[in-house]
Amino acid sequence: LGNAVDPFTIIGKYGPDATRWYMITNSQPWENLKFDEEGVGEVQRKFFGTLYNTYGFFALYANIDGFRYTEADLPSAKRPEIDRWILSELNTLIKGVDEALNEYEPTRAGRLIQTFVDERLSNWYVRLSRRRFWKGGQGEDKISAYQTLYTCLETLSKLIAPIAPFFAERLYNDLNAVTGREKHASVHYADFPAYHADLVDKDLEERMQLALKICSMVLSLRKKQNLKVRQPLQKIMLPVLDDKFRKQVESVQNLILSEVNIKEIEFITDTKFLSKKIKPDFKALGPKYGKLMKPIAAFIAAMDAEKIAQLEKEGSLKAMVENQEVVIALSDVDIFTEDIPGWAVTNEGTLTVALDIALTDALREEGLAREWVNRIQNLRKDKGLEVTDKITVYIESNPESDKAVEHNYDYICSET
C-alpha cells in the first residue's frame, strides 16, 4: 500500500543506531512520528559522522604522539580556558541528560547531546584546539588538550549508550583498548557519568556563548559579501551594550579574532552612524493586544533612534497608545541595521556587528598566502602524504605571487 516503512531496509541501509536516534530525537515518544528516511540519513551524517570524525581526529594525533593517558590528570586550574570551558559544558550536559532520562524524556536528552557534539565539541572546541595537537613536544598544554578531548569522547560514549548502544560500544572500546583506564569489558557495564559541579563555570560558558554568537554573525556577513574566511579583514565594530558586555568580549577577543580571521575589534559607544530600523512583529502583537495591534504597530514604525536604543538596552518600552499604557517588548519587534559604505552590518537581538569589508594590498597578499596553504594541504591529502612527511613546494613566479610569498614565507612553510 505504500503507507509503511520496512524497518529492516532502513536498518540495513543506515544501521540500528542512526534509526533509533532519529526516531527518539525527532519527536517525543508519546507523539506521532512523521517518518522521513532522509532524516535518518542526516542523523547518520551530521551526528554520528561528526562524532566519528572527532574521534578520528583525536586518534590520528594521539597515535602520532603516542598518547596513552598514563600521565596524572592535570588539575582544572592548570588547564587552558578553552579546556575548562568544554569540561564545564560537558558537566552541564551530564546533568541535563541525567535529568531528562530520569524524567522519561529521551528526546530532550538526545537533542542535548547532539547540540554539544555539533556546536560545542566539533565546531568550536576541536577547531580552536587543532594547533595544540599539531605542534611538536609534549608540554602541559598538549597533554591537557589530549586529556580533555579524551574525557569528552569517553563520557559521550556512556551518555549515548542508552540510545546508540553499538556506536557507544565501539567508541568506548577503541578508547579504552589503548589507555586501559577502565576495567569494564563493555560500556554497558560502566557507571553513568557523574556530574561534577566544581567543574562548572557558568560565567565562562556565558562568555564563550557570546564569542560563538559574534563569530556566527561575522561569518554570516562574510558569506553575504562573498568573502572567504581565508581572506583576512581589518576590523569589526561592536556597539558597547554595558560594562559587563565589554569585559566579556575582551576576555574572548583573541579567540574571536582568530576564528573569523579579523585583525582587531573596535568598541564603540556612539552608534549614531549606524542606521537602525524597526518594524512590528504582527504574529507577536496580535494575540497580545488584539484590536490595539494596528495603532501599536503604527507607534513602533514611527519610533526614532533614541527609542529604539532604549528598547534594546532595557528590553521593553512603555508607551501610551489610544489612551492606554502598553509595554512593548523586544520580542514584539524586529530590529535591523542597514549597511553603511565600506561596512557590512547585522544584528541579532540587542547585539550589533559591523564588519570592515575594505581590502588593502597587505590583506590581499595574506589572503593569497592562506589560499596557497589550503591548496597545498589538499595536494598533500590527494597524494596520500602523512602529516609528518616533509615536502618541497614550487610556485610559478609572477609579481603578485612573488610579493605574497616574500611577505608570508614563514607562515606558508609552517602551515604546510
Where are the regions a protein language model picked out?
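Feature 926 captures the class I aminoacyl-tRNA synthetase adenylation module centered on the KMSKS loop
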Residues: 1-12, 31, 40-416
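Non-catalytic, structured segments within soluble enzyme domains
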Residues: 21-22
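Structured mid-domain segments that build the active-site/substrate or prosthetic-cofactor binding neighborhood
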Residues: 25
